[in-house]
């Protein structure tokens, strides 16, 4: 039987650039891989609510500094790290006018990149696929 975990994955845009975060060596999974802003959805929590919480926690931008541009259909992604596990990903695209990011312990670096440059980064599984569903 496959176990599934519901998560949000958010991308922030600033002008023509997309924010990528490098996961720190202190997180449980996908250490030192580049990712969007993500987090596990708690019980009956709405995905959009979790998305905004994660954006504030991971990059320090509050509701006033972000605007929802698009949400995509839920995606199922098989986890290469765990047997019989999949991620149910709820993708969101937000924009911000503020490129100043305040990282918490979950991430060690950030880069504002052009969409086409995502292939140059060692990312969490299917990150490009999730991003392209939002564009």
Say what each PLM segment does.
Residues 91-93, 102-131:
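NUDIX/MutT-family hydrolases
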Residues 17-57:
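Conserved Nudix-box catalytic region and its N-terminal flanking loop in Nudix hydrolases
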């Amino acid at each position: 039987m496959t176990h599934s975990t519901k998560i949000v994955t958010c991308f922030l845009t600033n002008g023509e650039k997309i924010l990528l975060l490098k996961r720190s060596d202190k997180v449980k999974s996908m250490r030192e891989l580049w990712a969007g802003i993500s987090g596990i959805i708690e019980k009956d929590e709405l995905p959009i609510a979790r998305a905004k919480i994660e954006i504030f926690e991971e990059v320090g931008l509050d509701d006033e500094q972000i605007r929802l541009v698009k949400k995509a259909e839920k995606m199922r992604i098989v986890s290469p790290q765990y047997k019989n596990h999949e991620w149910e990903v709820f993708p969101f695209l937000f924009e911000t006018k503020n490129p100043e990011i305040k990282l918490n312990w979950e991430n060690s670096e950030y880069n504002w990149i052009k969409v086409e440059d995502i292939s140059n980064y060692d990312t969490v599984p299917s990150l490009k696929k999730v991003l392209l569903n939002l564009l």
